[in-house]
Amino acid sequence: MVHATSPLLLLLLLSLALVAPSLSARKCSLTGEWDNDLGSIMTIGAVNDNGEFDGTYITAVADNPGNITLSPLLGIQHKRASQPTFGFTVHWNFSESTSVFVGQCFVDRSGKEVLKTKWLQRLAVDDISDDWIATRVGNNDFTRQHTVEE
């Protein structure tokens, strides 16, 4: 019975050996346009040799939605990894608040790039006694709007 399954097993192992490098070789790139699960849109420019990047963010969620404007972001990523970790800060132009995001850029099994992030948003408050309510915490998943060729 071992001899009958050996060619099948060999074929399976050969297939895995050929497919596995292509899965791990796919590099996730931050550069491009992304949207998240809430409808916010982020554009990240080219990442320089130090891993630094800038871009813009337009949120779909705000306390005063009529005041939303495009806001700048600044960030940095680890360059060596094929699925790098990163962080960036958004300076909201329409409110007295700042957000920081940390996350990792993944390529899922279907080849789709996904940014998994956690964020903190600090709101300005008028009195130190309101400090306890001034920081919000959340998470967002971003998917690429357009494919980027490197």
Swiss-Prot record:
Post-translational events: Glycosylated.
**Record-given protein name:** Avidin-related protein 2
Give the primary localization class: secreted
- Which Pfam families does its entry note? Avidin
Binding sites annotated in the UniProt record for biotin: 36, 40, 57, 59, 63, 95, 99, 140
Organism per entry: Gallus gallus (Chicken)
Report whether Transferase shows up as a keyword of the record. Answer: no
Q: Could you tell me which PROSITE patterns the record lists for this protein? A: AVIDIN_1, AVIDIN_2
Task: Cite the Avidin-like domain residue spans from the record.
Answer: 26-147
Keyword Secreted recorded: yes
Q: Which GO terms describe its molecular function?
A: biotin binding
Q: Which SUPFAM superfamilies match?
A: Avidin/streptavidin (SSF50876)
Record function comment: Forms a strong non-covalent specific complex with biotin.
- Similarity remark: Belongs to the avidin/streptavidin family.
Quaternary context:
Homotetramer.
GO CC field: extracellular region
Q: Which Gene3D superfamilies match?
A: Avidin-like
- Source lineage: Eukaryota, Metazoa, Chordata, Craniata, Vertebrata
- Output the superkingdom of the source species: Eukaryota
Please list the residues annotated as glycosylated. 67, 93
- Keywords from the UniProt entry: Biotin, Disulfide bond, Glycoprotein, Secreted, Signal
Q: Where in the cell is it found?
A: Secreted
